[in-house]
Amino acid sequence: MQKQEMLYKGKAKSVYETEDNDLLILHFRDDTSALDGKRIEQLARKGVVNNRFNAFIMQKLADAGIETHFEKQLSDDEVLVKRLDMIPVECVVRNFAAGSLVRRLGLEEGQALTPPTYELFYKDDALGDPMVNESISISLGWATDAQLAKMKELSHQVNEVLTALFDAGDLILVDFKLEFGVFHDRIILGDEFSPDGCRIWDKATKKKLDKDRFRQSLGDVIEAYEEVASRIGVPLS
């Protein structure tokens, strides 16, 4: 499968057309961003680590019966995926309080959330990815009620699979975001799952092992990603 015209360049990935209209190629770059893209740096090995991490997670989800856009890994930093008509909202599942939830509600970071919370955010960097709800999403034509219900169902299924996976590596899956799209009238999981889009802490020390290391200038960002990968069994070589 050969890359053709670049369709889209995001903050950390580039999307390319292929000769098959149903398939795209994602290129994972070394770019790392924060503050809605206002701060961007290059971190060596990041594209390779995130591509392999994502491929591993997508396969685990597929093995659990969750349909994703993942087709196959093409190279160290490229993957073949189904072309989805993306729904412009992010689904965020939180098992513990962190990030914007702490700031909005004055919660203590690390407070357990039982049951896990589920939120929707409109994907728009210029607006700061504002929080929205199902009613807004339906009224503005972003998704149907049935599609939103399926996204919520799948998000909680993903949480069940991945909390167990990370727990086995003595890690806490604090929260994560997912993006979904439509493929031949089916809602399936798109985008990626990597430490860029979730929070992961060491179970014993609560050490942050995710993109918060970049956001908060803690250092050793890729080393943390590689540690997580090693502890859950991601093959990095």
From Swiss-Prot:
**UniProt GO molecular function:** ATP binding; phosphoribosylaminoimidazolesuccinocarboxamide synthase activity
> Could you give one GO CC term from the UniProt record?
cytosol
Which NCBIfam families does the record cross-reference, listed alphabetically?
A: purC
Q: Where are the transmembrane segments?
A: none
Name it: Phosphoribosylaminoimidazole-succinocarboxamide synthase
Organism of origin: Psychrobacter arcticus (strain DSM 17307 / VKM B-2377 / 273-4)
- Taxonomic superkingdom: Bacteria
A Pfam family assignment: SAICAR_synt
**Record family assignment:** Belongs to the SAICAR synthetase family.
- Name the pathway it acts in: Purine metabolism; IMP biosynthesis via de novo pathway; 5-amino-1-(5-phospho-D-ribosyl)imidazole-4-carboxamide from 5-amino-1-(5-phospho-D-ribosyl)imidazole-4-carboxylate: step 1/2
- What UniProt keywords are attached to this protein's entry? ATP-binding, Ligase, Nucleotide-binding, Purine biosynthesis
Asked if Ligase is a keyword of the record, the answer is yes
What EC number(s) does its UniProt record assign?
6.3.2.6
Q: Which GO terms describe its biological process?
A: 'de novo' IMP biosynthetic process; cobalamin biosynthetic process
Task: Fetch the SUPFAM superfamilies from UniProt.
Answer: SAICAR synthase-like
